[in-house]
């Protein structure tokens, strides 16, 4: 089955209407519940699960998110359910009737990184689905490589593991809601005879204007504002981050990785890293970003005072409103479509490389070219009219 995982970038971009023939709906082999479907990986799952050659398919897909269904997601073949999963009664009311679910893909979190709230959200999902979906087989939990260096709120108080990160490294002795989610997963799947998988993606390159940590969207907005104001694209990060190697993962590849673990017996009950299988440097990404927007690039300058991207963009709300109106873009607010604080963290980080050896040894051979993935995400932002 490993041939399927070698697909090209953007494979889910143009979905055929593969689930209908002569107006009659096909039967489904598997039914997915994607929690966090408007997020960066959730939206990719919504596309990749519906491809005609996706293993385990044909798939029916329920998509859950807190906000109303956005226009760009409404065009996807997903049964959308607006639900605040932090509310137990609302979650039970809306999800317990879904008795045909076979696989849960949990790719959601709350931005405060609060352990109790994130744990409650996950528990509410499992408590609503497991007792009612008699055909449930697998629960996929997505966390991330913060498992190896701590959550953002702990900052410099944490001594991270040495990279490259491998899945067998012990938990750091600091609060991390990933630990709470894993413990809940192990307990609930164990007592209900379900299989599970935990996925730890690297920095994700993908499309979703609703994501709290979308580096590509953030950089696209920054570059768009620079072009609008006829300013150079200045790198706001550290010297080390400018020069060191980094890794990332295409959101579609994360989706493929999670589907693989959900259907391939070799990958069941495993903790798995996920990245593109190559490395890049921000200095090269920065050059490509400037080229894509047709603006001058200014990289790291030795001795120059470093100004954070959040500081550079703090008064640009009205500028962004002008850009949206001038170019007839999908209406968005700056705080919705860009996370400058997150870019600042990425541009001050170094040596956060994870190993894909375990997944390869188990049979997952998927990969992406990180530079091409980055450009593809820019193209998608333009296709959906979020940037000019």
Curated annotation (Swiss-Prot):
The active site is at 146, 178. Substrate binds at residues 146, 178, 349. Changing residue 146 to A: Reduces enzymatic activity 6-fold. Changing residue 349 to F: No effect on enzymatic activity. NADP(+) binds at residues 38-40, 66-67, 84-85, 108-109, 142, 178, 204, 211-213. GO terms for molecular function: identical protein binding; oxidoreductase activity, acting on the CH-CH group of donors, NAD or NADP as acceptor; protein homodimerization activity. InterPro entries: NAD(P)-bd_dom_sf, PRISE-like_Rossmann-fold. Changing residue 346 to I: No effect on enzymatic activity. Keywords: Cytoplasm, NAD, NADP, Oxidoreductase. Its EC number is 1.3.1.122. Expressed in internal phloem-associated parenchyma (IPAP) cells. One of its GO terms (cellular component) is cytosol. The keyword Oxidoreductase applies. GO terms for biological process: monoterpenoid biosynthetic process. Homodimer. Iridoid synthase that catalyzes the first step in generation of the iridoid ring scaffold using the linear monoterpene (6E)-8-oxogeranial as substrate. Iridoids comprise a large family of distinctive bicyclic monoterpenes that possess a wide range of pharmacological activities, including anticancer, anti-inflammatory, antifungal and antibacterial activities. This is (S)-8-oxocitronellyl enol synthase. It comes from Catharanthus roseus.
């Amino acid at each position: 089955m490993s041939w399927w995982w070698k697909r090209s970038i953007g494979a889910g971009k143009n979905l055929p209407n593969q689930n209908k023939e002569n107006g009659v709906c096909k039967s489904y082999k598997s039914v997915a519940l994607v929690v966090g479907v408007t997020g960066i990986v959730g939206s990719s799952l919504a596309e990749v699960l519906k491809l005609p050659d996706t293993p385990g398919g044909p798939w029916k897909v329920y998509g859950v998110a807190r906000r109303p269904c956005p226009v760009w997601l409404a065009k996807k073949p997903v049964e959308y359910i607006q639900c605040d999963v932090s509310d137990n009664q609302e979650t039970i009311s809306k999800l317990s009737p879904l008795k045909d679910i076979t696989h849960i893909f949990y790719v959601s979190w709350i931005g405060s990184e609060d352990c109790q709230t994130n744990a409650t959200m996950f528990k509410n999902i499992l408590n609503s689905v497991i007792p009612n979906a008699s055909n449930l087989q697998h629960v996929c939990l997505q966390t991330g490589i913060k498992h190896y260096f701590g959550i953002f709120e702990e900052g410099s108080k944490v001594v991270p593991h040495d990279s490259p990160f491998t899945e067998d490294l012990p938990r750091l002795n600091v609060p991390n809601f990933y630990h709470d989610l894993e413990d809940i997963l192990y307990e609930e799947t164990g007592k209900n005879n379900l299989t599970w998988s935990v996925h730890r993606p690297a920095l994700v390159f993908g499309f979703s204007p609703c994501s709290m940590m979308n580096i590509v969207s953030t950089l696209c907005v920054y570059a768009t504002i620079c072009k609008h104001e006829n300013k150079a694209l200045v790198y706001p990060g550290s010297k080390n981050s400018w020069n060191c190697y980094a890794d990332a993962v295409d959101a579609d590849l994360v989706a493929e990785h999670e589907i693989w673990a959900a259907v391939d017996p070799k990958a069941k009950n495993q903790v798995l890293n996920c990245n593109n299988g190559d490395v890049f440097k921000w200095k090269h990404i920065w050059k490509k970003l400037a080229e894509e927007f047709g603006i001058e690039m200014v990289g790291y300058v030795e001795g120059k005072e470093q100004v954070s991207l959040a500081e550079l963009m703090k008064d640009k709300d009205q500028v962004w409103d002008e850009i949206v109106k001038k170019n007839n873009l999908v209406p968005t607010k700056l705080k919705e479509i860009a996370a400058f604080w997150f870019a600042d963290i990425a541009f001050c980080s170094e040596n956060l490389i994870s190993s894909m050896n375990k997944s390869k040894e188990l049979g997952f051979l998927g990969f992406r070219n990180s530079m091409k993935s980055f450009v593809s995400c820019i193209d998608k932002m333009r296709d959906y009219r979020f940037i000019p």
